[in-house]
Design a protein with these regions (language model features):
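A structural-propensity feature for long, helix-poor, extended segments
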Residues: 76-119, 215
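Amphipathic alpha-helical interface segments
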Residues: 106, 110-179, 183, 195
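Short, hydrophobic/aliphatic alpha-helical segments
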Residues: 29-48, 167-168
């Protein structure tokens, strides 16, 4: 599972609470109701935005993985896949929690970049400090959606593993998990790529661009396999170990 991304040192970080300083608002998106999060997303505030929305969508996909695995546990018909179901249930829950954290981190990273842009730039030293802060924040704003993208790969991979090896009554649910993971991946990829030009590091940008393409390709292949399996009904070859 992707490691936590670190905030850039030296940058003036404007956190989610500073962007939206209402003391009645919770410090984390996970503490909002679904309706409240949707309202925040629809508001004119800069956060949450597409990056946070992508992470939340992927979190829902991960939760569906956990749900389908749980619905499949203890069923004699699927007993040969009991280990897969146990692992998938745990993995789905872990990914769902991690992706909610990434939704918060995405808002914080954007806020850091917005704060850096507002730094003074009257003197050469101020301009240099502002540029360095913006580049550090842009790197952070690229690293966070990259972590989301990697988590999306884990979500879709888990969904693909369960397709055809789970409770048949939940087949559509695992299909939705794959769809959410794939859609969220495209959103995360877009957020990585849009921030790379502001990092000021061509080698880093090239490496990240290649990683994005590779991961998105892998996700699309896994999702296609999952949907093909689900479209063929309940039959599937057992896992190879």
């Amino acid at each position: 599972m992707p490691a936590a991304t670190a905030a850039p040192s030296g940058a003036r970080i404007a956190t989610y609470n500073r962007v939206m300083p209402d003391p009645e608002r919770p410090a984390s998106f996970r503490d909002l109701t679904v309706a409240a999060f949707v309202d925040e997303l629809a508001s004119g505030a800069p956060v949450p935005g597409g990056g946070s929305a992508s992470a939340v969508a992927a979190s829902l996909g991960a939760a569906l993985v956990a749900m389908v695995a749980a619905l499949s546990q203890g069923r004699m018909r699927w007993a040969e896949h009991a280990e897969l179901h146990a692992e998938s249930a745990a993995t789905g829950r872990e990914l769902a929690a991690r992706l909610l954290d990434l939704a918060d981190e995405d808002a914080e990273a954007y806020s850091a970049f917005a704060a850096a842009r507002k730094l003074p730039r009257e003197t050469e030293s101020e301009q240099a400090a502002r540029r360095a802060a913006m580049q550090a924040a842009a790197r952070w704003a690229s690293d966070v959606p990259m972590a989301t993208l990697e988590a999306c790969l884990s979500v879709v991979s888990a969904a693909e593993s369960l397709a055809g090896r789970c409770n048949a009554n939940a087949a559509s649910d695992i299909g939705v998990a794959a769809l959410l993971g794939e859609a969220a991946a495209h959103g995360a990829a877009a957020n990585v790529l849009v921030n790379l030009p502001s990092v000021g590091d061509d080698a880093y940008a090239a490496e990240m661009t290649m990683r994005v393409k590779r991961i998105v390709d892998d996700i699309q292949q896994l999702a296609a396999t999952a949907h093909e399996t689900l479209g063929q009904g309940e039959s599937r070859e057992p896992l190879r170990t």
